[in-house]
């Protein structure tokens, strides 16, 4: 992305375990014979359970075109793990670790953020950008400071998108981030910008439903046509008239899909594409994405 310093030579970009450009297969791209049929009887009262895979498509590697099979003819969502971590999307942290500086699981969304430091080899421009935003020298920057810092690199985001970024990279709603989280946000945005430009094939500054589907597949998320239509309608600034989304809304869309999928997989311990939540866990999972 124009104006961004290059990623560190150590390959720091957030979660790039397989090397940039080579993410694991999309979550749900292999058969899942153990998954119950769509529309299965819901669990007992007091629990909320997602249905098993209604209609999820398979996908290829990073940047690959959709499969020659009809969309959705691949394996069910929630397929058994391959040699890669179960469904780990491009840009995800190792499955054994919580987001930077955050406790794991479904703890309080207002838990304190653990102080952090810049990872070794962080680009000096990233350090300078953070320090310029950290006006009080506290070692933390808030939502408006992050918004201002990103705008210096031609990244104009709404506060809602900034709040989602902060939540996804800290797993808290304290709306402050430290050096390590800022570095992760910075390089993840750089990578997502590259993906957006890769799939904006007509260079319109927008991506349509087909381009969004391919972009999400490259990130490791295989969503059904119904979900895809909902995403486009939600994030299209014209209310669905253009049936296309711009870059800033693309980021918000990716953050929403990424966050909800990762929260779901924390409960899908049987790799079945189905999970059971208590009422409180369900509310704590969904509400941060609604009230960001």
UniProtKB/Swiss-Prot annotation:
Thylakoid keyword on record: no
Q: Does the keyword Transport apply?
A: no
Compositional bias ranges of the Pro residues kind: 22-40
Q: Which Pfam families match?
A: EF-hand_5, EF-hand_7
Q: Per UniProt, where does Ca(2+) 2 bind?
A: 200, 202, 204, 206, 211
Q: Keywords on this record?
A: Calcium, Metal-binding, Repeat
The record's section on InterPro entries has: CML48/49/50 (IPR044590), EF-hand-dom_pair (IPR011992), EF_Hand_1_Ca_BS (IPR018247), EF_hand_dom (IPR002048)
User: What terms describe the molecular function in GO for this protein?
Assistant: calcium ion binding
Q: Which Gene3D superfamilies match?
A: EF-hand
State the source organism's domain of life.
Eukaryota
Q: Which residues bind Ca(2+) 1?
A: 134, 136, 138, 140, 145
- What are the BP-aspect GO terms? response to symbiotic fungus
Q: What induces it?
A: Up-regulated in leaves of mycorrhizal plants upon arbuscular mycorrhizal (AM) symbioses with G.intraradices.
**The EF-hand domain covers which part of the protein?**
121-156, 187-222
Q: Where is the composition biased (Gly residues)?
A: 12-21
Map out region (Disordered) in residue numbers: 1-80
Q: What does this protein do?
A: Potential calcium sensor.
> What protein does this entry describe?
Calcium-binding protein CBP
